[in-house]
Amino acid sequence: MRVNGFTKTYDGRKVLDFPGMELESGKIYAVIGANGSGKSTFAKCFAGIIHADKKGTFFDKEYSVGYMPQKSYPFAMSVEKNIALGGTDIVRRDQLMDKLQITHLAKKKANRLSGGETARMALARVFMKSFDVLILDEPTAAMDVELSSISEDLMKEYCKENGCALVLITHSLQQAKRVADEVLFFYKGELKETGAKEQILYAPKEPETKRFLEFYGV
């Protein structure tokens, strides 16, 4: 699927310049870059949460797009009811709660959860529905290593089962190495380099990419 280019400007200053790209169903695209590089702005524009400068459609045709923000604000009802907002398949809901280790929280008010618990609930909710494109913004940032690994396995499973192009915003280069098929590197609001994971993480062409990877120890 073709994603058209777009920009985002705040107070006359361009903070994002995305030239567009092709997304392939069944692949995971990790979006990396330093803080303030435009990763979350890219995710929000792509998901339609904030408006890009250019009016029109992002895709060459109609696709369903899902989005999980970096910080979720659940409704003041039970965890299982929050998850059910994503879909009505009770068996699927229970399977996801079990895998994400939140079954014991099913009846608890979702607005009383910890950050990590809220993130797992939000993941379960978004995984209830099949999307053509799913955008996850730092979904495992509040999780420990074990739960992050479980969540990563679910991302890969969801992507393959649904034929979904999954766009993962992450601050963790190790996570990008583990789950991504392709990597997008943003630098000061620009998509500096994109390609296969092996190319971007181990043989980058752009000097900004090389400096970033050297600094963060890949």
Predicted features by range, described:
Residues 170-171:
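H-loop/switch region of ABC-family ATPase nucleotide-binding domains
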Residues 198-218:
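C-terminal boundary and immediately downstream tail of ABC-type ATPase nucleotide-binding domains
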Residues 145-147:
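Helix N-cap at the start of a conserved alpha-helix in ABC-type nucleotide-binding domains
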Residues 91-105:
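Conserved ABC ATPase "signature" region
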Residues 71-87:
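Conserved catalytic motifs of ABC-family nucleotide-binding domains
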Residues 109-113, 117:
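Conserved ABC ATPase signature
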Residues 134-137:
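Catalytic Walker B motif of ABC-type/P-loop ATPase nucleotide-binding domains
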